[in-house]
Amino acid sequence: MGADLKQPQDADSPPKGVSRRRFLTTGAAAVVGTGVGAGGTALLSSHPRGPAVWYQRGRSGAPPVGGLHLQFGRNASTEMVVSWHTTDTVGNPRVMLGTPTSGFGSVVVAETRSYRDAKSNTEVRVNHAHLTNLTPDTDYVYAAVHDGTTPELGTARTAPSGRKPLRFTSFGDQSTPALGRLADGRYVSDNIGSPFAGDITIAIERIAPLFNLINGDLCYANLAQDRIRTWSDWFDNNTRSARYRPWMPAAGNHENEVGNGPIGYDAYQTYFAVPDSGSSPQLRGLWYSFTAGSVRVISLHNDDVCYQDGGNSYVRGYSGGEQRRWLQAELANARRDSEIDWVVVCMHQTAISTADDNNGADLGIRQEWLPLFDQYQVDLVVCGHEHHYERSHPLRGALGTDTRTPIPVDTRSDLIDSTRGTVHLVIGGGGTSKPTNALLFPQPRCQVITGVGDFDPAIRRKPSIFVLEDAPWSAFRDRDNPYGFVAFDVDPGQPGGTTSIKATYYAVTGPFGGLTVIDQFTLTKPRGG
């Protein structure tokens, strides 16, 4: 059920020194505090209180709202999804929706999806309320609730319609800041987490993007003894940001969980309600696209094409070419759309890497995706998998070698004409305790995965086969900072002129989201309209 709530945006700006989101939620509570019950005002300072499976129930026996987060629909200017999870059946899950000045004006009933974790036999239920017919470039307030629990507040802003300025951010490979170590030395939660997985969430809020792209390997639940707790830890950490702005994911190899669905992605597919790509229910949510302003974002699932065996199970080729056919059609449609200037691809594994003794680049991506990126002139690719930051020169075409080495078409590093080639970014310093910035080759070289060997019981996977090559495409590498993200500021320009995206890579330097600018560059191209 969707909400039809078109009201004008509040014209008042937040007072100096008060955050925009605090201003919005405080205003909403003042207007409709009685509408959310006696605890309404207290919601403004609500915080995560631990994994949902361990929450103390209220008097009614209902668990609280857990892991509140947002996703965009296919049209980010009019569609949003509010999601939260529990491990118990709940009654009447719903979202109260309104504006900061007018209060809650409608109620949207949520649909519930569930999966049963094969390792713990615990069933997780995720409620998704689809908000539709929203007004572009507008602030909303909402409260997620089900019977017998206290509502949780959030704010949401729709994307602008057409060519308007906007900001988004991107990083991958986050993990969680909650390690969950027991007295006997075992970990019940993510065993490669670090405090920086929490710091980066605070840092994203300091930048306040319209949305954040999370480039795969979200929480590493497939490495954890307790997968349910690890997912809950991840959402508890990130709801500090994701309840205020959509975090749009790409699935990584560590979202592949043995026993959870036919190809291992039931948890990921249940927690997120991303735009429908028209794929079968079994493949739902593994690839998708959405439009924000003049930017078309396409999220891909690279395990379908990668040679590397990096998950709990080897699933290369699982879609039978369905994802590639969808991608080609999606890119063609984007380039036919006169309202789209920029095409950005978000994915996990990478076609470029100068890390030694780590994952490396994957030939499967170079074979399956890069020819399409060239054909349809994709502007920007953001990925993770390698736990550091680096970027390529604009790339177009490939050498006629077995590794299909991408060809740089320009070496200017500050101002880049994106019509000449695609810039690839590795942004994998999201927070894990295994960064790779200290593992970079002294001079740019690349280990390319060209295949896999037979299954090795000692490592419980198929070992990668590597070919080492030079990396003439390498433009910038951050050796010094293990953690960070990139912010992208879209400037639509003027009719008849150019449009640009200014990219700023920030190193996250400690508690409270400390930031240091490390790399900047600007993509530019003729404006389409």
From Swiss-Prot:
Residues 1-52 form the signal peptide. Keywords: Signal. Gene3D superfamilies: 3.60.21.10, Purple acid phosphatase-like, N-terminal. One of its GO terms (molecular function) is metal ion binding. This is Uncharacterized protein Rv2577. Residues 1-20 are annotated as: Disordered. It comes from the Bacteria. It comes from Mycobacterium tuberculosis (strain ATCC 25618 / H37Rv). The keyword Signal applies. One of its GO terms (cellular component) is plasma membrane.
